[in-house]
């Protein structure tokens, strides 16, 4: 970079970049130079730029203190030893009503089922409280906390630690439905927490207590004195734990002895009893009823070419047994003589035969026979060989829709084409071969029946 006086010597040596200094070698008179002097530019000053910055650094103020929570709800769980409680409510005591039942389960190793939808605890926590102010209002709360930091597994007929516990889930507190209530209300009768439900769904929207499977937990019961549920001023809190209430959360019972105890002690465990709803005999009967299933409801006012659905709309499944050769139906027998022969090996369902007039009525297997059946019409019985002797055995619905039995044949059995009334009948598209006996020989039908029937293909 070149200085201007080097580029333009004609300007002389008095040319300066800065303001002229008084008394210096300058082409300006001293009085004029003093008038054009800028004292503020002699020494740079940055005070104007730093005037907003204080010398001492600022310190951020502390946030306002939050209202303290009850001390029992914020403490970490400790190993249970004896019924313990905080003494901020002096004179208050809590006793476990069903202590003997809990001790019986605890001696074996209590297990609690947890499901996605939530499962109630059994035994449930049932306590009695004394020492409350009859006029003051209290809240009863229950939460479940882990006992230790281990995960368990059932091995060798006992529970053993099998690693580190999973991260603790968000704590949830169950509030008794009667809360808040007066002390006289709580002391009048035992307080039961039988509605508490345990779940393993972390996204549970119903407020159930969320637990990990194969972890050991213990319920805690809190008694809070407060005017209302959302009050920030707590009048006192007392927490209680009982060592016999520890349990291991499972998705299925691991110890057979626990299953037996639950069956014997739980009045709602009828599903496991021999005479209960889920005993083998009842389960088999329910499965058979479901496999048969009710016939789909017929639509009213169908046309001449439309007909209600028949047994092809249902599925018999694999419950139909293969028939033995000696139990196979004898070809050539009339219908009244054939039905008793095939009853032991063939499973009856139903199909509908619409009549010429009248609205269709669906055959309902669940209705007692005394209310929905009547004997065959005399016009039909007179055309059946030997029908007079078996008229009381074969009955049909008392409606304008005639339900004839459909015979479920064994899966590998051929169609009995030797039967004259089975000619031209197709198989239904079921898992088993079903022969729809929806047509009878023309000589056996009364004149007022439709023939052929619309819903046969």
From Swiss-Prot:
UniProt record, GO biological process: cell fate specification; positive regulation of DNA-templated transcription; regulation of transcription by RNA polymerase II
Region (Disordered): 1-31, 60-90, 272-334
UniProt main location, coarse: nucleus
DNA-binding region range list: 101-274
Bias type Basic and acidic residues, positions: 272-285
GO-annotated molecular function: DNA-binding transcription factor activity, RNA polymerase II-specific; RNA polymerase II cis-regulatory region sequence-specific DNA binding
Keywords from the UniProt entry: Developmental protein, DNA-binding, Nucleus, Transcription, Transcription regulation
Location of this chain's protein in the cell: Nucleus
Cited InterPro entries: p53-like_TF_DNA-bd_sf (IPR008967), T-box_DNA-bd (IPR046360), T-box_sf (IPR036960), TF_Brachyury (IPR002070), TF_T-box (IPR001699), TF_T-box_CS (IPR018186)
Transmembrane stretches, start-end: none
Top-rank taxon, per record: Eukaryota
GO cellular component terms, A-Z: chromatin; nucleus
Comp. bias intervals (Pro residues): 62-82
Quaternary structure (record): Forms a dimeric complex with DNA (in vitro).
Function: T-box transcription factor that plays an essential role in the determination of the fate of axial stem cells: neural vs mesodermal. Acts in part by down-regulating, a specific enhancer (N1) of SOX2, to inhibit neural development. Seems to also play an essential role in left/right axis determination and acts through effects on Notch signaling around the node as well as through an effect on the morphology and motility of the nodal cilia.
Protein name per the record: T-box transcription factor TBX6
Protein species of origin: Bos taurus (Bovine)
């Amino acid at each position: 970079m070149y200085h201007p006086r080097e580029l333009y010597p004609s300007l002389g040596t008095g040319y300066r970049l800065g303001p002229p200094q008084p008394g210096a070698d300058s082409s300006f008179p001293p009085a004029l130079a003093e008038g054009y002097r800028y004292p503020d530019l002699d020494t740079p000053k940055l005070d104007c730029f730093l005037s907003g910055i204080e010398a001492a650094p600022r310190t951020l103020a502390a946030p306002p203190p939050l209202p303290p929570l009850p001390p029992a709800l914020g403490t970490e769980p400790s190993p249970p030893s004896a019924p313990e409680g905080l003494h901020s409510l002096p004179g208050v005591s809590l006793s476990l009503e069903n202590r003997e039942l809990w001790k019986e389960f605890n001696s074996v190793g209590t297990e609690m089922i947890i499901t996605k939808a939530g499962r109630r605890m059994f035994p449930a926590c049932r306590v009695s409280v004394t020492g409350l102010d009859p006029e003051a209002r209290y809240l009863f709360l229950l939460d479940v906390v882990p006992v230790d930091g281990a995960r368990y597994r059932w091995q060798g007929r006992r529970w053993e630690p099998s690693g580190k516990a999973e991260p603790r889930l968000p704590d949830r507190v169950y509030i008794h439905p009667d809360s808040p209530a007066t002390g006289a209300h709580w002391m009048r009768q035992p307080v039961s927490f039988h509605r508490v439900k345990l779940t393993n769904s972390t996204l549970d929207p119903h407020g159930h207590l969320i637990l990990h499977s194969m972890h050991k937990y213990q319920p805690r019961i809190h008694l809070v004195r407060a005017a209302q549920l959302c009050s920030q001023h707590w009048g006192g809190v007392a927490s209680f734990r009982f060592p016999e209430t520890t349990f291991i959360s499972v998705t299925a019972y691991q110890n057979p002895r626990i299953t037996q105890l639950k069956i014997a002690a739980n009045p709602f465990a009828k599903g496991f009893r021999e005479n209960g709803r889920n005993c083998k005999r009842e389960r088999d009967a329910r499965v058979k009823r479901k496999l048969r299933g009710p016939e789909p409801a017929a639509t009213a006012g169908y046309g001449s070419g439309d007909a209600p659905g028949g047994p092809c709309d249902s599925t018999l499944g694999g419950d139909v047994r293969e028939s033995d050769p000696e139990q196979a139906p004898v070809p050539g027998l009339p219908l009244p003589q054939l039905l008793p022969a095939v009853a032991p090996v063939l499973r009856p369902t139903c199909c509908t035969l619409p009549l010429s007039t009248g609205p269709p009525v669906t055959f309902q297997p669940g209705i007692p026979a005394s209310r929905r059946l009547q004997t065959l019409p005399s016009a039909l019985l007179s055309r059946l060989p030997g029908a007079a002797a078996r008229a009381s055995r074969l009955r049909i619905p008392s409606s304008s829709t005639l339900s004839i039995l459909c015979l479920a044949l064994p899966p590998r059995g051929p169609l009995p084409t030797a039967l004259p009334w089975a000619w031209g009948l197709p198989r239904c598209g079921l898992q088993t071969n079903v022969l729809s006996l929806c047509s009878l020989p023309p000589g056996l039908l009364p004149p007022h029946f439709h023939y052929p029937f619309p819903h046969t293909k």
